């Protein structure tokens, strides 16, 4: 494959797999059973995704080597009018993307819950690129998968191989955070709040090479929906796997944790207070990740109780998102009839976080999911979003007067600053790191943009300007354009490489990238587009280089030299 004998598409994929292996320090490759590819919606993949898929077209040998499924699209194409999407050529662009993936031999399941599709439980090695699915499957099933990006999963799908690294290695599958629960957790939304809360406690000084991997003690027995809600929201902050005493397999014994935290009744109450709706709710969205049959039935039960009082939902103020598989199941048991009779809109093939909302109608959403809230409030949609249990969500869908007043304003919200351990450095600094096999030699110099906090590309880096737009982040308001960008690794959505590729295509990307940690969210874009990329330094550049320093980087014989030419005077 590397020599191009199997076509240019598989050659590109093989080069990327080799680059990932080199970066991860993998000494061998593993055969992979199946893959799940993210980056489907027009608003997530954007220009970078469409151009990349276009570049792959026309190669008859460029089809996947293993069974591969596809993540959620940005709409239910049968209900475009009801969704009111106001986005030029959205449906045409969406069809183009899905068709391009289908041409690669990928099954267009259009679901972000590949673990909930009625097939026998999968095991072995997978290459999955939907963050909630990665965390769910590693935690509750026998499938082993690293937290792949959309591009790294696609490369493995095309080749059938992945580097053996990360969670493929048993010794790396152990907890690094201990979480003690000291409150009742009775509602599914409580579990969603918990997963997100854990991520918010992470300190930059904690050594979490594979991401936060908590062991949680003190939780009661859990339904499928509770377990799903926990792993989905934990994945907001890069969690690829977790353990829950009495629910998952026993956690390996560790002698010390990077952090030990306690979640109390006061913490749960405070988060609900912070997340409660302030101002009129315009739309209720349930199903992020796409709703299970159990979630649909719970929603229908709450809806039926209001219907029996003679109430109806006006203007389709409740949207329930599902996979096509689960949609078919509820259409056969009466659940769909109840929801639609009440006035709810039940959608398939899409998800709340990847849908472009019509802002002439919807400026304040209510959901039961912290995963939805995390991405809906980001730059992806930048729409104020509140959180409550399903029964409260349904109440707001029926009665738009429960909370009065204007929609909340995200611009006016005060974000808690991210924890950072960076201090200003004045001493001379030079370090040696490594490049990637697909890059032979380069030299760059320029202004450094540096943080010790991971960067979340999807939703928090403006795909048009390259400006980081994440309140509380140390680099909030800074542009990555034409910088030497130095940071630990990417975080958040596995669609990150397509956002970065789009910025590089349009001239708003960095001139070079330095990662401290192994980063399958960043490396693929650099590998495929030839952006100078360095990693594995003998000293941590995220602490030793200041934003504003003049820096030189050079690659020769696989080694990268990083030199601070002059220090910034700004502190």
Model-found features: residue ranges?
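Intein/HINT protein-splicing elements and their conserved insertion hotspots or analogous self-processing inserts
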Residues: 402-432, 437, 555-559, 563-571
């Amino acid at each position: 494959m590397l020599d191009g004998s199997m076509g240019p598409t598989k050659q590109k994929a093989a080069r990327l797999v080799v680059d990932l292996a080199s970066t991860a320090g993998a000494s061998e490759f593993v055969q992979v059973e199946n893959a799940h590819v993210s980056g489907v919606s027009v608003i997530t993949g954007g220009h970078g995704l469409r151009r990349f898929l276009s570049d792959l077209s026309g190669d008859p040998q460029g089809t996947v080597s293993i069974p591969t499924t596809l993540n959620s699209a940005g709409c239910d194409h049968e209900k475009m009018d009801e969704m009111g999407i106001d986005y030029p050529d959205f449906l045409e662009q969406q069809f183009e993307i899905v068709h391009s993936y289908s041409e690669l031999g990928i099954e267009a399941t259009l679901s972000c819950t590949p673990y909930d599709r009625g097939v026998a439980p999968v095991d072995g090695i997978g290459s999955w690129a939907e963050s909630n699915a990665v965390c769910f499957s590693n935690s509750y099933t026998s499938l082993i998968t690293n937290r792949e990006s959309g591009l790294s999963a696609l490369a493995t799908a095309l080749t059938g191989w992945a580097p053996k690294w990360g969670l493929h290695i048993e010794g790396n599958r152990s907890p690094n955070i201990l979480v003690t629960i000291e409150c009742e957790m009775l509602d599914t939304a409580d579990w969603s709040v918990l997963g997100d809360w854990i991520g918010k406690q992470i300190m930059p000084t904690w050594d979490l090479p594979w991401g936060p991997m908590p062991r949680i003690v003190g939780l009661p027995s859990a339904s499928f929906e509770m377990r799903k809600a926990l792993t989905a929201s934990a994945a907001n902050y890069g969690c690829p796997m977790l353990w829950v005493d009495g629910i998952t397999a026993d956690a390996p014994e560790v002698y010390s944790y990077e952090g030990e935290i306690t979640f109390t009744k006061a913490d749960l109450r405070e988060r609900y207070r912070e997340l409660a709706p302030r101002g009129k709710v315009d739309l209720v969205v349930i199903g992020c990740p796409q709703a299970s049959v159990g979630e649909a039935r719970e929603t229908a039960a709450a809806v039926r109780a209001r219907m029996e009082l003679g109430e109806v939902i006006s203007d389709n103020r409740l949207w329930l998102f599902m996979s096509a598989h689960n949609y078919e199941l509820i259409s056969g048991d009466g659940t769909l009839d109840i929801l639609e009779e009440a006035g709810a809109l039940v959608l398939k093939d899409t998800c709340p976080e990847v849908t472009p909302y019509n802002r002439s109608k919807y400026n304040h959403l209510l959901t039961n999911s912290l995963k939805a809230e995390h991405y809906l409030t980001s730059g992806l949609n930048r729409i104020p979003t509140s959180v409550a249990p399903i029964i409260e969500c349904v109440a707001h869908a029926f009665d738009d007067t429960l909370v009065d007043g204007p929609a909340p304003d995200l611009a006016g919200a005060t974000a808690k600053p991210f924890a950072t351990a960076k201090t200003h450095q004045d001493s001379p600094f030079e370090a040696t790191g490594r490049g990637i096999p697909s890059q032979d030699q380069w030299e760059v110099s320029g202004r450094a943009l540096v943080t010790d906090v991971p960067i979340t590309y999807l939703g928090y880096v403006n795909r048009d300007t390259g400006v980081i737009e994440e309140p509380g982040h140390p680099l909030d308001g800074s542009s990555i354009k034409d910088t030497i960008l130095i940071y630990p690794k990417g975080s958040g959505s596995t669609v990150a490489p397509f956002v970065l590729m789009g910025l590089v295509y349009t001239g708003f990307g960095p001139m070079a990238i330095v990662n401290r940690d192994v980063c399958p969210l960043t490396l693929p874009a650099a590998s495929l587009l030839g952006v100078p990329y360095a990693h594995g330094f003998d000293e941590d550049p995220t602490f030793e280089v200041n934003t504003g320093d003049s820096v030189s980087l050079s690659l020769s014989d696989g080694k990268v030299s990083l030199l601070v030419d002059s220090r910034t005077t700004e502190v």
